[in-house]
Each structure stands twice: as structure tokens, then as C-alpha cells.
Amino acid sequence: MKVVNLTGRIKIGPSEVLHQEVLEPQFIYELEYYLLYYVAIEKVLLTEYKRLELITNENKEMIMKILDKVTKESINPDPTANMSDIAFAIERFVEQNLEGEVPAWHIDRSRNDFQSCAQIMFGREQLLQVIKEMRDLSNSVYKLAKKTVYLPMPGYTHYQAAQIITLGFYLAAVNEQILLVMEKLLGVYDEMNKCPLGAGAMAGGEFEWERNRMAMLLGFSEPRNHALIAVASRDWTLQISSELSNFGVFLSRFVTDLIQWGSSEYKFIDLPDQLSGISSAMPQKKNFPIFERIRGKTAHLHAFYSDFVLGQRNTAYSNLVETSKEAGTHVITMFETFKSTIRLLKTTVDNLSFNEKRMLDVCTEEFFGGFSLANKLTLSSGIPYRRAQVIAGQYILKMMETGFRPEHIDIGILKGIGLEHGLQIKLTSEQLKSAFDVTHNIENKKTIGSTNPNDIKILMDEQEKRYKDIEKQWDKREEYIKKSVSQI
């Protein structure tokens, strides 16, 4: 199997097993995901060859037209013709279609910066798609939060009823996390969007490539300022996967709450039939396996991050197939998994219905006002706060033992407990009643970021402004790419 005019170093092309197990799958992968970027890079290099007066304008235009004919159908992995390497395949395709030799075409160039550049262009495009999905999710969560600012529901700590909140308060927290991740990914994008092209194999080129212009034409903000970093680093895969993995932790917790709320014990939420499942044996059941799918998918995000870390760990800091290709095998799978997760979650958010009566019933069944009662005892009667906590707890226990609900207040029992502690309780019946009132427990919160609907409205107005700014920043970056590459 003789190699056709590609190297003088080896005489025989790739073996069948190497071709089938490694090179052909890699070629097909790059054909699917990188070809568009490879062609764009070739065109930018071509303009530089012309600027450097290494080729004529006539040759430049001829090669440009040939590059336009490079498609998924026009090149293929061939161990003898191109060593099953897509960069060589493009080179061979152009050479075979030239009307005459162009000796300086492809002078002073390497696959290393060529491949690194295409990979980053692919990665940033995928990241832009991720952000679009997250923007859609944010919009859905925001709209639902705004509609439910006044809808009371029980809040839990340690899986026990704790304080009354509103659904809008909870969902505003979800949206806050989404916005935070989109903001953090702006920094990741800006750091990764530095052009490796012109770095050569690892030490730079021997011609004065105009790297700033090459970077601009390919949609980068600037050239990567160190040739070794340009070809050795794949930090962008670690940074993106790290952020998505971390966000996956939060998503899993959010979905866990949804799973609990949808259980037969809670009965807080419901989904339409088209998003629900059934039991094959228990006809009374209506299941929500979509939540389990979403939560299960978040686990893969952590695995992808670990995979990229382990794929790069203990490798030499230089260009390596191990880090540039093998370690990134599942990059596209990570992006697709994340986008799928977000689309599924958005669909559930858009279709959730809430059992408002059930949520309110739980708010009135549990003694959520204990915290407020302790505060009132201290303020009205001068009782030291820790002792006020003890008295409030004893009052609640007594009421539970006698079978009373929170609204069935008994100021006599409370004052009797106070006397047992040698204290005079001056709290009125009206004040005691307010401590266990659902609306009072929501509206009496006064700190910034509390469940008070007024605070949540302020927060959501701020979130709307942040969202618009984030949207503007991402749109600006995407528009810059479109404008830049249109000049090629």
C-alpha cells in the first residue's frame, strides 16, 4: 500500500485496522462537523499567500473556485491517496483540479494550527447553540415565575416543612442560576475565541503572516499570543464542560424538586398526557418519566467533563493526537446531550400545571409560623430570643398534640407556657393569629431577595434587564462572526 506523494519519511500507508478503527471514523467525524471551517481557513490562508506575493491573483482565484467544490461528497478517506486524513484529502483535491502547479501553495503551514483553529470554530458555534437553548429556557421560567409571584407553597429544609414561599420566588431562583451560567459562559467564549492560525506546528511560522487579519476574517477577537498554547491547549473543552457540568448539578436538584412535587404524596404539579407515562401493571398510575430522563441526562454532563480531564491529564504540553482528537471524542455528544436536556426541561416548564388548592392546604396544615412567632414574642414581651424559640416550639407541640390546626390559635395556652417559664407574654390574639397566617408569612419578609412578592418583582425586573444585556452580548458575538466570515 504505497503512499502517494505525501511524505518521504514512510513508504507504506495506514494498515487496514488503523484505517477502520481510527482514521476513517475520525475523517467522517471531521467531514460532518469541521469541513465548513477547514474550507474557510484554507481560503483565509490563500489570501495571505497572495498578500505575501507567494502566489498570483490568478492562482488565488483558481484555488478559491476549487475550494468551493470541496464537499462531503467530493472527498473521502483513502489510505493510499490521502492517508485517510481530511487535511491531506483537501490538499489532494485542490492539486488534482489545478490547471498547473502552484508551488508555494501550502508553504510554511501545519495541520496543527489548522486543526486547532477548526475545532475552536466548531466549539464556539456549538456554544452559541447552547446559549440559544438556555435563553429559551430562561424565557419560559421567567414567564412562569412572573405569573406565580403570589402563589403560596410550602418551602422545605432537610426535607421537612420549613417556611411559606411562593412558586414565583422559587422559580426566580431557577432563572437566576440560568442567567448566571450564561454570563459565565461569556467569559469562557471570549477566552476561547482567540485564533491559533499562524502558530504553525508549535513554534510559529517562517513568513510574516498577518495573524490579526486572519483572526478577524475567521470571526476571532484576536490571535492566540503564544504559538505553543495555540496548538497544545484544549482548555476550551475543559472550561465549557466544567460550566455545563456545574449547571447540571443545579438542574438535577431542580428536577428532583419537580419529581417530589409530582409524587402521589405531594400532588403539587401535573403534566399533560402527552408528556406522561403509565404503568404496564398498575392502571391507577400516571408517571412522569420525562423528569427522570432529564435528571439522568445531567449525570452524563459530569462524565463528559471527567472524560475530557482524564483525556488530557498527564499528556505532554504540545500538539498531540491524544489531546486534540481522542480526548475530544465526546465533545459533540456533550453539546447534544446538554441541548437535549434543556429542550426537555423547557417543554416541561411550558406544560406544567399546579394544584394551587393542594399547595395552599399544605401551607395551612403545617405550623409554618413558628419562626415569626418567636420574633413576635421577643419584640412584644422582651423575651430573650432563644427562650422565645423554646416557648414557640412548646406551643406548636401542644397544639399538634391536641389536634388543632395552625389557624385554631389559643392565646391562653401560649400565655400558660410563658408562665411556666416565669415570663409574662403580652402578645395579643391578633398577633398570634398573624404569625400563622399564610399571607402574613409571605408579605412580612422584608429583606432584599426574600419571598415577599414586592421583592420578587424587583428582582425579576432586574433579571429582565440582565437577560436583555446578556442577549445583546451574545448576539453581538454571533453577528461579529457572520460579518467577519462574509469577507472571506
What are these regions (language model features)?
Residues L45, Y49, I66-E73, F93, ...:
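Generic, well-ordered alpha-helical scaffold segments in large soluble proteins
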Residues T47-I55, F122, F169, L238-N246, ...:
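Short, well-ordered beta-strand elements within core beta-sheets of diverse protein domains
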Residues M1-I41, N97-E101, M282-I488:
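Glycine-rich cofactor/substrate-binding loops
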Residues D78, M134, S138-P152, M182, ...:
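Long, hydrophobic, amphipathic alpha-helical segments used as structural scaffolds
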Residues M1-G204, W209-R211, L275-S279, F291, ...:
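A helix-coil-helix interface module used to build multimeric assemblies
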Residues Q119-K132, K146, Q160-Y317, E322-T341, ...:
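Charged, flexible cofactor/metal-binding loops and thiol motifs
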Residues L35, E42, A87, E91, ...:
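Short runs of predominantly hydrophobic/aromatic residues within well-ordered alpha helices
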